[in-house]
Regions:
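Short, amphipathic alpha-helical "lid/cap" segments that border enzyme active or binding sites
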Residues: 82, 86, 162, 283, ...
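Active-site loop/oxyanion-hole signature of alpha/beta-hydrolase fold enzymes
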Residues: 57, 63-100
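Conserved hydrolase catalytic core segment
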Residues: 55, 96-137
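Short beta-to-alpha linker loops that shape the active-site pocket of alpha/beta-hydrolase fold enzymes
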Residues: 60-64, 131, 294-296
Length: 318
């Protein structure tokens, strides 16, 4: 019997890149896609919890961490990333058995593209809060928000962009969804972060808080290395992933045809925010189910054990 805590690593050559992937456990295949600037390390705790039931595969997306591109980085495409996923499924499930797929935030966008493009390779897809602005009541406001975040990065760097993101997505009393005005305000507030550093404005701490679990004790050397890798991915995410992925227009016809295999996840604490509003809007449009998860948009890092337990239930539901 395979030790579910043992990690088997490998490299997969895909069109234009080489993907680092990690596999734990045994059973039906479950592929877990990291979102934002995260890599496979974001799922270390959750993957170990789920590996008693599934063969859990995680990976570094192309252009991140240990998955180098063959050439210079350019704007990324959800469709290309979706095709990468199917190549990984083909490698790990050579008998053709379909796999379950989980994605959160930007990787939830990839999950939607994968289901639309390759429905026969997927048994169940859980897309947790895909920030697809096309599904918002005001798509232009959503596009403007993420464009403002990218511009903050171009003008003032990672710290300003992360502050703009946090400000733009923060709820205000009586407001249904955030907007670009507060993203710009957040960028201005972060402009003096170098001169007046605080925990809220420190770029590395902000990136760690966004992408990695807050440990109850000092991080191990392995955890520290993971945090550094994910922080180093932020420029690629902010320049080449954020706007192309949030601007993705889902294939509603294809998703409606596969709605029985699709679940849209929303955070208990983030249902009024842009990504959850988009998720619920998509569910209504295509007739897919909605499942509430612990925490907010980054609930998988806020409450990893509770999140894993909820994901286990959602994957097991028929």
């Amino acid at each position: 019997m395979t030790d579910r805590t043992a990690v088997r690593t490998g490299l997969l050559t895909v069109d234009g890149a080489t993907l680092h992937h990690e596999v734990r456990g045994e059973g039906p295949l479950l592929v877990m896609m990291p979102g934002g600037s995260a890599d496979a390390g974001i799922y270390d705790a959750i993957a170990a919890d789920l590996a008693d039931r599934w063969t859990v595969a995680t990976f570094d997306p192309r252009g991140y961490s240990r998955s180098p591109l063959d050439g210079p980085v350019t704007d990324q495409s959800p469709a290309t990333h979706a095709d990468d996923i199917v190549r990984l499924i083909d490698l790990l499930s050579p008998d053709g058995a379909p796999a379950a797929l989980f994605g959160s935030s930007s990787s939830a966008v990839v999950a939607l593209a994968a289901l639309a493009r390759h429905p026969g390779r997927l048994s169940r897809v859980v897309a947790h809060e895909p920030p697809v602005v096309a599904l918002l009541p005001d798509p232009e406001a959503g596009r403007a928000l993420f464009a403002a975040v990218r511009e903050a990065f171009r003008q003032d760097g990672v710290a300003a962009a992360m502050a703009a993101m946090a400000a733009g997505l923060a709820p205000e009393e009586g407001e249904a969804a955030p907007g670009p005005e507060r993203a710009a305000s957040g960028s201005e507030q972060a402009a003096t972060a170098e001169e007046n550093p605080t925990p809220e404005r420190n770029a590395e701490q902000a990136a760690t808080r966004e992408q990695a679990p807050a440990p109850e004790r000092a991080p191990t050397p392995e955890q520290a290395a993971t945090f550094r890798r994910m922080h180093a991915n932020l420029p690629v995410f902010l320049e080449h992933v954020l706007c192309p992925f949030s601007g993705y227009v889902p294939d509603l016809v294809a998703l409606k045809a596969s709605a029985a295999h699709l679940v849209l996840g929303v955070g208990r604490d983030s249902r009024a925010l842009l990504p959850a509003v988009a998720a619920e809007g998509l569910a209504r449009r295509v007739g897919a189910g909605v499942a509430e998860f612990p925490g907010g948009h980054i609930g998988l890092t806020e409450h990893p054990r509770a999140f894993a337990a909820r994901l286990r239930d959602v994957l097991a539901a028929t």
